């Protein structure tokens, strides 16, 4: 297995409830290492840019509003099979369908307020990491 990097975000519903440490602990327990992290309050413009892939979807406006409603923690995670491992630890997008022991089963409030975001492929991981971090900010 190759060591890879992925992008991870702790969303406003989770930071609002002081779950940052608990979520990071679950990621680290799964063997993922945080190699870059910062707390940001997204502007509407940043949220629109980050989620531009969804701009034609009916939920786009609500997503942008939610993501700019409070602080997020953006991170770069590193580990073996990091993308798949992070997605496994996060659980299904809809917390009602998430497996026991996953972040979303434990902490998500709804399909919209589902506590975390993670890249789904190497290409999106690279794009999402570059959106928030310069190369010098990633130290691992």
UniProtKB/Swiss-Prot annotation:
It catalyses: a 2'-deoxyribonucleoside 5'-diphosphate + ATP = a 2'-deoxyribonucleoside 5'-triphosphate + ADP; a ribonucleoside 5'-diphosphate + ATP = a ribonucleoside 5'-triphosphate + ADP. Keywords: ATP-binding, Cytoplasm, Kinase, Magnesium, Metal-binding, Nucleotide metabolism, Nucleotide-binding, Phosphoprotein, Transferase. The active site is at residue 117. GO terms for cellular component: cytoplasm. The keyword Endoplasmic reticulum does not apply. PROSITE patterns: NDPK, NDPK_LIKE. Its main location: cytoplasm. This is Nucleoside diphosphate kinase.
